[in-house]
């Protein structure tokens, strides 16, 4: 079946749930805000300063409260800590109807067993560096290029840096919407039928919608086939990551995830259905920590976010719908 879903993704995400009542900000919070401003090279007008300080203090308190409780992951300040939900929703979050082609057909998998852990980052130069999508809902393009970059490197030994901007600008005919969202599975189909994707150096990322400038003579990576993993089949995802390639997937981001810093992310507030997923990422491995199964996931919010741009998320429970729309490309090399 095909599942209609809105895929939202943003270069910056909400860190609070919206406008908040006026807070009495203490000296410690002011000190940390000024340190954070210096770290992130932020400057404000006097009016904006007070507003940003309020947002920061609100998020700071949520982080402190979370970290004092017995959770499987820790939170921390990041580059988005002076923002509210209303602001991010207005500026960065987009919703366009999508069709999750990863639910179209059954993925034929073996019976295992598979290694108890896997990390493609430790298998040589087959995982490209973490990138930053900026203020554009283009997470799906980074998940796509990351998967294909790894596929080409695994098959040929050659590491490329592929052009996310080409996907932003050119893949609309495959039901993608540039900075308004899209799906890796549909982007793989675009590359397959478009006869290739260019390198980033030839088609630089600008983080906004633009006219298509694809030059087929400069295409450097090609897709031979697209593997769409059966809806909610995390065991098939394990097999794919263990034996073949990092896997693109989409899941639902909720407020606590945005402040993730370390540990195994788990949430009781997110949903598990295709219609709720709103961010696309790349599973590059899996493992177990203190009896808790997890995925190793590459994000596209820069290397300063999370664990050097990566995060761990609980595995085996379709956490936040991560098994609702998973796929990977078979490269033509």
UniProtKB/Swiss-Prot annotation:
GO MF annotation list: aminopeptidase activity; cysteine-type endopeptidase activator activity involved in apoptotic process; cysteine-type endopeptidase activity; cysteine-type peptidase activity; endopeptidase activity; HLA-A specific activating MHC class I receptor activity; identical protein binding; kininogen binding
SMART domains xref list: Inhibitor_I29, Pept_C1
EC id: 3.4.22.16
Main location: other
Tissues expressing the protein: Widely expressed with highest expression found in non-skeletal tissues. Low levels found in skeletal tissue.
Disulfide bonds listed in the record: 100-325, 136-179, 170-212, 270-320
Keywords, ordered alphabetically: Disulfide bond, Glycoprotein, Hydrolase, Lysosome, Protease, Signal, Thiol protease, Zymogen
SUPFAM superfamilies according to UniProt: Cysteine proteinases
Subcellular location per the Swiss-Prot or TrEMBL entry: Lysosome
Annotated glycosylation sites: 70, 99, 228
Metal-binding found in the keyword field: no
Propeptide segment residues: 21-95, 104-113
Keyword field contains Glycoprotein: yes
Signal sequence bounds: 1-20
Cross-referenced Pfam families: Inhibitor_I29 (PF08246), Peptidase_C1 (PF00112)
Family annotation (PROSITE patterns): THIOL_PROTEASE_ASN (PS00640), THIOL_PROTEASE_CYS (PS00139), THIOL_PROTEASE_HIS (PS00639)
Reactions catalysed: Hydrolysis of proteins, acting as an aminopeptidase (notably, cleaving Arg-|-Xaa bonds) as well as an endopeptidase
Sequence intervals crossing the membrane: none
A single cellular component GO annotation: cytoplasmic ribonucleoprotein granule
GO biological process: bradykinin catabolic process; cellular response to thyroid hormone stimulus; dichotomous subdivision of terminal units involved in lung branching; ERK1 and ERK2 cascade; immune response-regulating signaling pathway; lysosomal protein catabolic process; membrane protein proteolysis; metanephros development
Catalytic center residues: 139, 279, 299
Family: Belongs to the peptidase C1 family.
Assembly information from the UniProt record: Composed of a mini chain and a large chain. The large chain may be split into heavy and light chain. All chains are held together by disulfide bonds.
Name assigned to this protein: Pro-cathepsin H
Organism: Mus musculus (Mouse)
